[in-house]
Every structure is written in structure tokens, then in C-alpha cells.
């Protein structure tokens, strides 16, 4: 009888809890975006994911269309022209 209780205790301790409502988040754009049915207010849709949902990126994300690395140093001196 003690063996049965020990077996049940071990079985219940190793059981993975089921969390309802939590789903695996599908990432896109090199883990920069999240696939959603509709993007949040501060996100922009970009292309589509494998499950035909929009790939939502934060509005501040910059996307390189050419595929080359761009200079992303946006310091004040490089952003505005110098005044004489």
C-alpha cells in the first residue's frame, strides 16, 4: 500500500501542468516580430506568417529592404545637417 502511494506521489509530481489559454508564440522576421491575427496599437503589420496571420513588428523597428547591413547610428549629429 505504501508503494502505491509512493508511486502515485511520484506520478503526480512529474505530471506537466496544463495551462489553459497559453499558446506557443510564433515568431517572425528573425524573432523581431510576433504572428497575430491583428496587430496591437503600437505595432505595424509586415508581410504574413506561415499561418496566414500578420507579422506584427514594433513601430520603431527598421527593416532593410536591400538585405545589406545599414548604418543605424542615429545620433543627433548624423540625423540633422550642420548649420553654418
Swiss-Prot record:
Please indicate if the UniProt record lists Lipoprotein as a keyword: no
Q: Where in the cell is it found?
A: Secreted
**Which tissues is this protein detected in according to the database?**
Abundant expression in the male reproductive tract only. Expressed abundantly in testis, while expression in epididymis decreased gradually from caput to cauda.
Keyword list, A-Z:
Antibiotic, Antimicrobial, Defensin, Disulfide bond, Secreted, Signal
Please provide an example of a Pfam family that matches this protein in its UniProt record. Defensin_big
Q: Which residues form a coiled coil?
A: none
Cysteine-cysteine disulfides = 28-55, 35-49, 39-56
Q: Which GO terms describe its biological process?
A: defense response to Gram-negative bacterium; defense response to Gram-positive bacterium
Instruction: Give the signal peptide range.
Output: 1-21
Q: Name one GO cellular component term.
A: extracellular region
What does the function comment of this entry state? Has antibacterial activity.
Q: Which family does it belong to?
A: Belongs to the beta-defensin family.
Q: Know the name of this protein?
A: Beta-defensin 119
